[in-house]
UniProtKB/Swiss-Prot annotation:
<dbReference type="InterPro" id="IPR050261">
    <property type="entry name" value="FrsA_esterase"/>
</dbReference>
<dbReference type="Pfam" id="PF06500">
    <property type="entry name" value="FrsA-like"/>
</dbReference>
<comment type="similarity">
    <text>Belongs to the FrsA family.</text>
</comment>
<dbReference type="InterPro" id="IPR029058">
    <property type="entry name" value="AB_hydrolase_fold"/>
</dbReference>
<dbReference type="GO" id="GO:0106435">
    <property type="term" value="F:carboxylesterase activity"/>
</dbReference>
<dbReference type="InterPro" id="IPR043423">
    <property type="entry name" value="FrsA"/>
</dbReference>
<keyword id="KW-0378">Hydrolase</keyword>
<protein>
    <recommendedName>
        <fullName>Esterase FrsA</fullName>
        <ecNumber>3.1.1.1</ecNumber>
    </recommendedName>
</protein>
<dbReference type="InterPro" id="IPR010520">
    <property type="entry name" value="FrsA-like"/>
</dbReference>
<comment type="function">
    <text>Catalyzes the hydrolysis of esters.</text>
</comment>
<keyword id="KW-0719">Serine esterase</keyword>
Length: 414
């Protein structure tokens, strides 16, 4: 089936789909305090979703393109779930968040199909994949339109990979007790087996959101990247997130001995946000298999155990947490009790001595991840490194931090 036909088949005009902000029915929804963080963006008044400009621009989206799509959403006079929130237009039509971002992605997909130059076509496919992922953001369970956008994002990503430098392999890994999971192995030029980074992404991202990390930071250092969707989303959607948050990644890590392109004696894990919960767990449970673990803005204890910190987090992020935990109808109190069990300190891991080298980067006054969180990680390691990342200029400092982190990983793998 062609890309155009797939888009038409998936996105037939319908108005019965539950709108994204209505999927999680939590009680005691409060007012939204202003909040901004480098990795998550900020909660802008009159928007349900956090507007994550840094990460979208880092993934290659032009700031003007973001504003253009936002303007189309704002200008819509279609029915909304909440008249006060622009991005809650009901149904797949003009003004709906998923519709507008998917429409933008389809324009790039069409350009990719018409482009004769393979490299340029690959770039356009990659851009289309990124925009489809933004359409599906924040990837709540049961969001049918978002799941269709994710399917198109994955297809576009596969098309891009065929045309861009290096090589990409789509791999299936068996996980006992449930469905297999699909991972993408990105390999730089040269002969393998390669030292490899196992990417553990945030809860509001897809595994295809990290190509920039591979292309700009890992591939130039001769390091491969293996990506995997977090439980309950994407290719891991049949798995619920549990207190054993690293279950899927752990089985994949063990299976790397059978992957000929990966040097299983030189593997590191890199965790963004809640992905750090997975990565640090692996540092304790699979120390012999990991040479190093790096974290960025980790969510391993404070946000999971401190009700006051949870009360400052935007509604969308609490909805993401509730969705991942399968608690679509939970009160905030029930959600807090459950989240506490995901703290690696409560689980008795963090605070114990860990032989795996661990690095953690943090921003001062990060509402999701205080400095103490990163200090707890690095002080628990027999070889810890702490990095403070200045907030402004946000993009340049983010790039500089990633260069420093990947240098540290390279030093331990190569």
């Amino acid at each position: 089936m062609t890309q155009a036909n797939l888009s038409e088949t998936l996105f037939k005009p319908r108005f019965k789909h539950t709108e994204t902000s209505a999927l999680v029915r939590r009680f005691n929804r409060g007012s939204q305090p202003p909040m901004q963080s480098a990795l998550d963006g900020k909660n802008v008044p009159h928007w349900y979703r956090m507007i994550n400009r840094l990460m979208w621009i880092w993934r290659g989206v032009d700031p003007r393109e973001i504003l253009d799509v936002q303007a189309r959403i704002v200008m819509s006079d279609a029915e909304r779930t909440d008249d006060d929130l622009y991005d809650t237009v009901i149904g797949y039509r003009g003004g709906n968040w998923i519709y507008e971002w998917a429409k933008q992605a389809m324009d790039w997909q069409q350009k990719a199909c018409q482009e004769q130059d393979a490299m340029r076509s690959g770039r356009y496919w990659l851009h289309a994949s990124t925009l489809y992922n933004i359409a599906a953001y924040p990837h709540l369970k049961g969001d049918e339109l978002a799941e269709q956008a994710q399917a198109l994002a994955n297809r576009a990503y596969e098309e891009a990979a065929q045309r861009l430098p290096g090589s990409l392999r789509e791999m299936e890994f068996a996980v006992p007790g449930g469905s297999p999971v699909t991972a993408f192995l990105h390999m730089p030029k040269g002969d393998g087996p390669f030292p490899t980074v196992l990417m553990c992404g945030g809860l509001d991202a897809m595994q295809t959101d990290y190509y920039t990390l591979y292309e700009r930071y890992l591939a130039p250092r001769g390091i491969a990247m293996l990506t995997l969707d977090m439980p309950s989303v994407g290719f891991s959607s049949k798995w619920k997130l549990t207190q054993d948050s690293s279950l899927i990644h752990q089985h994949v890590l063990k299976a790397l001995t059978n992957v000929p392109w990966v040097d299983h004696t030189r593997v590191a894990a890199f965790g963004f946000r809640f992905g750090a919960n997975v990565a640090v767990r692996l540092a304790y449970l699979e120390a012999p298999r990991l040479k190093a673990v790096a974290c960025l803005g980790p969510v391993v204890h404070a946000l999971l155990s401190d009700p006051q910190r949870q009360s400052t987090v935007p509604e969308m992020y609490l909805d993401v947490l509730a969705s991942r935990l399968g608690m679509h109808d939970a009160s905030d109190e029930a959600l807090r009790v459950e989240l506490n069990r995901y703290s690696l300190k409560v689980q008795g891991l963090l605070g114990r001595r860990c032989p795996t080298p661990m690095l953690s980067g943090f921003w001062k006054n990060d509402p999701f991840s205080p400095e103490d969180e990163s200090r707890l990680i690095t002080s628990s390691s027999s070889d810890g490194k702490l990095i403070e990342i200045p907030f402004n200029p946000v993009y340049r400092n983010f790039d500089k931090a990633l260069q420093e982190i990947t240098d540290w990983i390279h030093h331990r793998l190569c």
